[in-house]
Structures are given as structure tokens and as C-alpha cells.
A protein has these predicted regions:
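Membrane-embedded, hydrophobic transmembrane alpha-helices
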Residues: 2-210, 414
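Transmembrane catalytic cores of multi-pass membrane glycosyltransferases
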Residues: 51-52, 127, 237-240, 331, ...
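Active-site lumenal/periplasmic loops and adjacent helix-entry segments of GT-C-fold
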Residues: 54-55, 61, 181-185, 201-346, ...
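Membrane-embedded helix bundles of polyisoprenyl
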Residues: 92-107, 132, 136, 140, ...
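Membrane-interface helix-loop-helix junctions at transmembrane boundaries of multi-pass membrane enzymes
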Residues: 152-157, 205-208, 362-363, 406-414, ...
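Hydrophobic, aromatic-rich transmembrane alpha-helices
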Residues: 197-202, 466-467, 525-552
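Transmembrane alpha-helical segments
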Residues: 383, 601, 633-670
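Signature aromatic-anchored transmembrane alpha helix within multi-pass, membrane-resident enzymes
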Residues: 447, 463-468, 606-652
Length: 891
């Protein structure tokens, strides 16, 4: 770090600093917690009286749920010396654990007691408050005899750069206001420039000291996330619409039913429990919980990564690694559409942080590892299976290196990674990379060599418990749809194993084969992305395979990185694997581990190029080059990464090509304006039930415990099947009708109709209506009989009627919106006029009307291909039944 501090214009005197107290006493902690608790009660009481104070309750509620339970748990565990950053990270992780556990336990207890509304304001508030007060008592009794402070958090903070950083997220609020209100994106462009300036100030050792690097990481993360999430008053993206719908159903019904939907997200507590509780406690609409609170929680992921990298490399490398992670577009565009994965990645990062932490008590470390692992299970099934695969392979490699007969493997680790039995590590004189990464050349390091994680942290028992818990959870929630999907994925991969690197089944290969969009800047963008991958590959290879070089990366992390790189390659090569999560999301997940290797690869390659250049210039008589000093390389890398960010977020495209995206304009098709939302809500409230014709229904019955299929017929124009049956023998028969999914409507089964032949016993059910499937996309099927007590030989007329939600057609983005509002039959595509079902409606949003086009999506293998088509032919022979100058509905 340079000893000179500077502003943008001159070298100022030493900046004023503020020192945060180095201790938090038991008395002070309990006083703050109880004050927040009482303030929350008062605010809720005022709300009951009809007095609402804007901003205050959402802020107090957020702080209460996000920090208070976790801080108290840390105090009970006497985890005093974590430092302020790790204290915040673990406190948030433990607070989320407490909140999710409360929601799950209440659901189980209320279901057992047959009480209907565990997710009500009074129930949630009482439960959380009771647990907080209980934790306060535990904190008091476990620490009252210990004179030491609860937390040691001493840190010197320069006031001017701190205030400068803290202002930046508020600029995001202002810049998005300009876009939403005036459709002006200049504020967004300016803010991206400010972020670039912050990165360069850090790289050039100006203004911002290293103590503020974690704050800078958080500020950059939350700013670029808010630049996206605060656009529009509605949510952006596909998955998050379904997540909102499920969470809203919990709030509306006051209860979470684990099997109320076949949608896999219904088993994710990170959506169906966490969001409703935040909404209730903070008095914040569910939309804004997803748009504000979830991004704030997700912004802690890069902060956690900074701690992981800082424990192994120097602070500058840790910061630039985090900035690269945040600069990848999926971080701020794709992840904001996946609320469950935002929470899951936080738990995943906490697991890795535990792996590289050496200061923590081993028993507490193991307990936290298990807790965060279980929370990952109920947060995101895809990321959990990736994580447990990584952990299992890491355990396997490290176990082989430990046990007898593994001398060859151990020798490989010693020679390839640089671990020596004498615990003396020497960097060769020609190797200058470690200086820039926190290791000095020509210096013997006498500290013990890194060792694998404690046996109690990553063991086969821990991994087995997590896997069994996940299997049980995914089997018993969301009607087992997660388990079905995983089995289907494995089957698809196994059945197509001969199609390695086939672009039809690999999104990454398809993108590379298709090449970039025409235009110089698009080609530069593609080249930079390929270059990033090259630097990461080079970095991993340098660590693992190059002899006699030693980095401060721990052995478990190196093994984890190698496994992660292998998974990334497999997601490209294996059919269906990358597409299951979407390949850009897979790449974003792997960056959690691989981000620092871009820095390592960049620096080493530049140093090698510098050596060659130096030799050439020396022979030409120009002397030795000093252009590749460590500090200059860090600055060069910072400039490169800022350029990468400005390419990824559309800044350079906006300046040179007038390009618009959702962060810069509301006049793009993936942004829902007020008129489009109003029109969609009108359609949702005016949808009708229509008969389903041309659908096959099977009528079956049980007699003496044996199932018989009676008939299978097609519904007529009225959605009915009418048929007669004559019985030749007496006895009881239980009839029901069933409809099998046809790709548009889900399975549905009617209730039982008892038919007692040759007896005067009256059936209690002459008409059965479907109740088996409560999904909005499931049709209703009714079965009735003309009589349920016929005589032998007397004909009985059975009537089956199949009805379903009215079909509403919309383009790709509007279909997502309509589905989130509960329209179970919002469909794509508009390819041919004769595909439009009778009795259906067509919904057009603002973008469709202004451009007279609709966006449809085709699939070529696993690759989604977007196509804009003219809408005139679809609406020319239909009646306009709704219009608000920004949305239209045709019948």
C-alpha cells in the first residue's frame, strides 16, 4: 500500500479517521437487541392502529431478522475473535438459519394441531420475538461470568472514503428513478463510470485504504444489483415470477403446503418461508422483498469471497478476484431472477469460508458446516448437488493422500504444489509472481505447510448425512418433482453419452460454434470472455502442475479448484448437464471458486511475456524492461477488468451503438411497465373456465379391491363424455375418471362415485369432482351417474365433464407475467394461426403494441432460439376486449 494518500486533484493531509470501539460488552449488546425488539413491537402496534411510518419499519424489520438472531447465537457460542467482516457474515448466515427453522417448525406443529395459519403476522412475530428473548437469556447466562468483551471489532476507518463509498448505492436509487420516470439512462452510465473509478483508485493505492476493501466490495455488488432490480415496479425474469407466486400463495393462505405444487421451487424454504416472513416482519410488499432484501443478502456473497481469498492471497488480489466475479453479467442479470439461488450461494460461500478458516474451534466449525450444509439443501437443489459432489471428491482425494499406500499421491502433491516434508518453502529467484500474490521471492517461509481440513469437518459421515437429508427432503416435497428431474437428467446424460461436445446438447459449444454477433465491439466482447477463460485455465494449471512453485492457497482449496474446473469442462462436454441449470449460471457458480485463478493466470502470463520482452529489448540495446513489476501488473489487470465490466453491462455498446437494455431503458421487451402490469392483472381477474374438447379421459373402477379399466374416450365439443353401462351382477363398484397430462394441462382425477348394484344402500357420493391436484394448470374433472343404486340389468348413464382455465396467449415475457398472476394456461408460441385454441384470448404488452412484434422461443436441442414475429395476422380477425393504451387483450 502506498504511503501517499490522494484525492482526485492533489495530495491531502492525513485523512481524518474514526476508530470503531474494540469491544462489544454484554450489557451493550442486550440493550441494543431489546431496543430493536421494542421498536419493532411499537411500529407493528402503530400499523394495527392505521399509522404507518414509511421506511422505518422495513429498515428495522430487515435489521432485526438479518442480524439479531445470528449475533445472539455467536454470543452464546462465544465466538469473539472473528473480526467485523466474518462476524457479519456468520451472523447473517445464522439469522437466516433461525428464520427458516422457525417457518419450518411452525408449519410442522400447526399441521399436527390442525391449525390453519402459521404464516400470520401475530404467529410469526410472537415466535421470532420469543426465540430472540430466549437467545438473550442464553447469551446473558453463558457470558455473565466472563469479563472478556463479546466481540473484538477494532478497526480504523477514514471518514472521507467511507462516506464516498456509502453514497454510491443511493446513487443507484436515483439513477433507476430517472430510468423508471423519464426513461433516461445517463445516470446509470455515470454510475458505472464511478464504479470503474473506485476499482482504479484501489488498484493505484489512492484514497481507499485496504481496511475498506470489504466495504468497497459490498458497495460495488449492491450498486450493480440495484441498478437492475430497481427497474420497474414488477419483477424481472422467469424463475422469480414462479417464486413470487409460491411465496404469495403462502402469505395469502397463511400456510405452506409442501406438496401443493409440482413446481420444484415449492420445496425451497429460501422462497416459500424466508420471503413471507421478511414481508410480514418488515411490512414490505413481497415484490420489494425480492427486489431489495434478496439483493442485499446476495451482495454479501462477494464479501464472503473476499474473506476466503484474503486468507490465502493478499488483499489486492482478493479484491480484484471479487471484482471479476461481480463483473460477469450473470451476477447482476441472471442471479436477480433466481431468488432461491441468491440465498443458496450465500450458504455455499459460508461453507467454503469454514473450509479455509483455521482460527475457529473445531467443534463449532463442524457444527456450523453441517448447519449451513442443511440450509443449502432447502435453498437450491441444483447448487446443493454440485456442492456435495465437490465435497465428496475433495474428501476422496485428500483421504487417498492421507492413508497408507498413497505415498505416490502425497509425493505428487509435494512436488507439484510445493509442500516439503521439512516444511521449508523456497521460491526460486527467477519467479516473481508470488510477490504480487502475497508471497515474497527468495524467502524461506518457516510456517507449517497447509494441511487438509480437520477430519471432523469434511468426512464421509458429514457428506452422507447431507445427501440422505437432501434425498428425503426432495422426495417428500413438491410431490417429488425434484427427484424426478434429477433422475431424468441422469438418464438423458447416460442416453446421450456419445454426443460429447455436440452443440445441439451443449449450450456453451453452441455459442462458440455460432460465433459472436456481427460488429467489432461484439467480437471484442467475445474475445475478452475467451481470454478470461484462458487466464483461469492457466492459473489452475500453474498451481497444480508447475513444479517448485508455492502459493499461499491451502491444499483443500487447490483440490476444490481442480474439481471445480473439471466440473466446468464436464458441463461443456456432457450433453444436457450445462443446460439443466443454464450454462451461464454454471459458469457463475464455478467462479465462486475459480475467480482468483484469473488473477494468477494473468499475472504469470504477463510476467512471462515481460521476461521475454526484457531479453529482446536487452539484446536490442534498450536495457531491461520494468513494465511488469507486481504493482504495475495489478493496475493493468484492474484496467482490464473495468473494461470487461463496461463491455458486459452494455456501457460501451450504449455509447457506440445506442444499445439499450433493462438497466438503461423501460422501452425494452423484458421490462414490465405500469400499463402492461395493469392489463395482465385485468386478464387474470377476468379469466373464465372453459370446456376442454378433444381430450382423452379414462374411466375406471375398483371392485373387490381390484382395478378395472372400463373405457377411454375423447371429450366432445362441450368437454363431455356420456356413455351407458349395464351391470350383469350385483356388487359395489367405485368409479372414477382420470385425465393424463397432454403437455398443456396436468394430470387430474375425479373423486370416487360409489355404484351399488342390486342393493338399496344409497351411495353417499353420486357426483365426484376432482380434488387430487390443486395446481392452477390442472383441469377440473367431474364424474356423475344417473343412479348409484341400479338393479342388475338396469342401464346407468355416466357423464364426465372436463373443464380448465381459459387459454391466454402471450409472447415469451408476457407469458411469464401472466403465469405469475395465476393464469395456469398462458401459452406460447404464435407460430401458426391454427394453433390458437378456440375460446382463447391474446394478450399484448406495451412493447408488442409499439413494435407490432411478439417474441417467441424455439428450441434446437437444449438451445433456446428467440424469434420476433409480426402480430397483425393474429389479431386482425379478433375482437379487442380490453385496452389501456399500453396493453391489449383480444378474444
Amino acid at each position: 500500500m502506498s504511503s501517499h494518500r490522494a484525492t482526485f486533484f492533489c495530495d491531502p493531509p492525513k485523512p481524518e479517521t474514526h476508530t470503531i470501539p474494540n469491544s462489544v460488552s454484554l450489557k451493550n449488546l442486550l440493550a441494543v437487541v431489546l431496543s430493536i425488539q421494542i421498536a419493532l413491537w411499537v411500529l407493528m402496534g402503530l400499523n394495527v392502529l392505521g399509522i404507518s411510518i414509511p421506511i422505518v419499519q422495513p429498515l428495522i424489520g430487515f435489521l432485526y431478522l438479518t442480524f439479531v438472531p445470528g449475533i445472539l447465537v455467536l454470543a452464546v457460542l462465544r465466538m469473539r475473535n472473528l473480526g467485523i467482516v466474518e462476524t457479519i457474515l456468520y451472523a447473517v448466515g445464522l439469522s437466516l438459519t433461525v428464520v427458516l427453522s422457525i417457518g419450518l417448525v411452525l408449519t410442522i406443529i400447526f399441521d399436527a394441531l390442525n391449525i390453519l395459519t402459521p404464516f400470520s403476522l401475530i404467529t410469526i412475530t410472537s415466535s421470532v420475538s420469543f426465540l430472540v428473548l430466549l437467545l438473550c437469556a442464553f447469551t446473558y447466562f453463558s457470558n455473565r461470568t466472563h469479563p472478556k468483551p463479546l466481540f473484538n471489532t477494532k478497526i480504523s476507518v477514514p471518514l472521507t472514503p467511507t462516506l464516498f463509498l456509502c453514497i454510491i448505492p443511493f446513487l443507484a436509487v436515483f439513477s433507476t428513478y430517472l430510468v423508471n420516470t423519464y426513461n433516461v439512462g445517463a445516470g446509470q452510465l455515470f454510475l458505472w463510470s464511478i464504479i470503474g473509478v473506485v476499482v482504479l483508485l484501489i488498484a493505484f493505492d489512492k484514497v481507499i485504504p485496504s481496511t475498506l476493501y470489504p466495504l468497497a466490495v459490498f458497495v460495488i455488488a449492491i450498486t450493480i444489483l440495484f441498478q437492475q432490480t430497481l427497474i420497474s415496479t414488477w419483477l424481472y425474469g422467469a424463475d422469480i415470477q414462479s417464486e413470487w407466486n409460491l411465496a404469495n400463495a403462502v402469505l395469502t393462505a397463511g400456510i405452506w403446503n409442501p406438496n401443493s405444487s409440482v413446481v420444484q421451487y415449492n420445496g425451497m424454504l429460501s422462497v416459500v418461508v424466508l420471503a413471507p416472513i421478511y414481508s410480514l416482519i418488515s411490512n414490505l410488499d413481497l415484490i420489494w422483498v425480492f427486489k431489495i432484501i434478496y439483493p442485499v443478502l446476495f451482495a454479501l456473497v462477494p464479501v464472503g469471497l473476499y474473506q476466503i481469498f484474503r486468507k490465502q492471497l493478499n488483499v489486492k488480489v482478493a479484491f480484484l478476484s471479487c471484482f471479476f466475479f461481480m463483473s460477469f453479467a450473470t451476477f447482476y442479470t441472471g442471479m436477480i431472477t433466481l431468488a432461491r439461488q441468491e440465498i443458496a450461494e450465500l450458504f455455499f460461500v459460508l461453507l467454503i469460508l469454514l473450509l479455509v478458516s483455521k482460527e475457529m474451534d473445531q467443534r463449532i466449525q463442524s457444527a456450523l458446516f453441517m448447519v449451513f450444509g442443511l440450509l443449502l439443501v432447502v435453498s437450491h437443489y441444483g447448487l446443493f448437488f454440485i456442492a456435495v459432489l465437490f465435497l465428496f471428491l475433495m474428501w476422496l482425494v485428500l483421504t487417498i493422500a492421507r492413508v497408507g499406500g498413497s505415498k505416490l499421491t502425497l509425493r505428487h502433491l509435494q512436488t507439484k504444489i510445493g509442500i516439503h516434508t521439512d516444511k521449508q518453502i523456497t521460491a526460486p529467484s527467477h519467479w516473481s509472481l508470488p510477490r504480487s500474490l502475497g508471497v515474497h521471492k527468495d524467502k524461506q517461509i518457516t510456517e507449517p505447510s497447509p494441511s487438509p481440513p480437520p477430519r471432523s469437518l469434511v468426512t464421509i459421515l458429514t457428506i452422507s448425512v447431507l445427501f440422505i437429508a437432501a434425498t428425503a427432503w426432495y422426495f417428500f416435497t413438491a410431490q417429488g418433482s425434484v427427484s424426478i428431474r434429477i433422475v431424468s437428467l441422469v438418464s438423458n446424460i447416460a442416453g446421450s453419452i456419445g454426443d460429447l461436445f455436440n452443440p445441439r446438447y451443449s449450450e456453451a459449444v453452441y455459442v462458440v460454434a455460432a460465433g459472436p454477433v456481427s460488429g467489432l465491439l461484439h467480437r471484442v466482447n467475445a474475445f475478452v470472455n475467451y481470454l478470461n477463460v484462458f487466464f483461469m485455465l492457466a492459473g489452475v494449471c500453474l498451481i497444480v502442475f508447475l513444479k517448485n512453485q508455492r502459493f499461499k492457497l491451502q491444499v483443500p482449496y487447490i483440490v476444490l479448484s481442480s474439481i471445480t474446473l473439471g466440473f466446468l469442462i464436464a458441463s461443456v462436454a456432457l450433453p444436457y448437464l450445462g443446460a439443466e441449470l443454464n450454462w451461464t449460471r454454471v459458469f457463475q457458480i464455478t467462479l465462486i471458486v475459480l475467480a482468483p485463478f484469473l488473477v494468477i493466470g494473468f499475472v504469470k502470463i504477463c510476467e512471462a511475456a515481460g521476461v521475454v520482452t526484457g531479453k529482446v529489448t536487452s539484446k536490442l540495446g534498450f536495457g531491461n524492461s520494468t513494465l511488469v513489476s507486481p504493482s504495475r501488473l495489478m493496475r493493468l489487470l484492474a484496467i482490464y477488468l473495468v473494461f470487461f465490466l463496461l463491455l458486459s453491462n452494455g456501457f460501451l455498446f450504449a455509447l457506440t451503438e445506442g444499445y439499450q437494455n433493462m438497466a438503461l431503458s423501460t422501452q425494452v421487451d423484458d421490462v414490465y411497465n405500469h400499463e402492461t402490469i395493469a392489463g395482465a392483472k385485468w386478464q387474470a381477474s377476468n379469466s373464465v373456465t372453459v370446456p376442454l374438447s378433444g381430450k382423452r379421459v379414462t374411466i375406471s373402477y375398483f371392485a373387490d379391491g381390484v382395478r378395472y379399466e372400463d373405457t377411454s374416450q375423447i371429450t366432445d365439443a362441450n368437454g363431455q363424455i356420456i356413455y351407458n353401462q349395464t351391470f350383469s351382477s350385483a356388487g359395489r363398484r367405485e368409479y372414477y375418471a382420470a385425465f393424463a397430462s397432454d403437455g398443456f394441462y396436468q394430470n387430474s382425477t375425479s373423486a370416487i362415485v360409489d355404484v351399488n348394484v342390486g342393493t338399496n344402500q344409497v351411495s353417499s357420493n353420486a357426483t365426484g369432482q376432482s380434488t387430487a391436484n390443486v395446481s392452477s394448470a390442472a383441469p377440473t374433472i367431474t364424474l356423475s351417474a344417473s343412479t348409484t343404486i341400479p338393479e342388475v340389468g338396469q342401464p346407468v348413464t355416466f357423464t364426465i365433464k372436463l373443464t380448465g382455465d381459459q387459454v391466454v396467449y402471450g409472447d415469451y415475457y408476457n407469458t411469464i407475467l401472466l403465469s405469475s398472476l395465476g393464469i395456469g394456461q398462458a401459452r406460447l408460441p404464435f407460430f401458426l394461426q391454427n394453433e390458437i385454441a378456440n375460446g382463447s384470448n391474446i394478450f399484448l404488452g406495451t412493447y408488442n403494441i409499439e413494435h407490432n412484434t411478439i417474441l417467441s422461443v424455439n428450441f434446437e436441442g437444449v438451445n433456446a432460439l428467440a424469434d420476433y414475429q409480426n402480430v397483425t395476422s393474429l389479431t386482425s380477425n379478433r375482437s379487442l376486449i380490453y385496452s389501456n393504451a399500453g396493453a391489449s387483450v383480444y378474444s
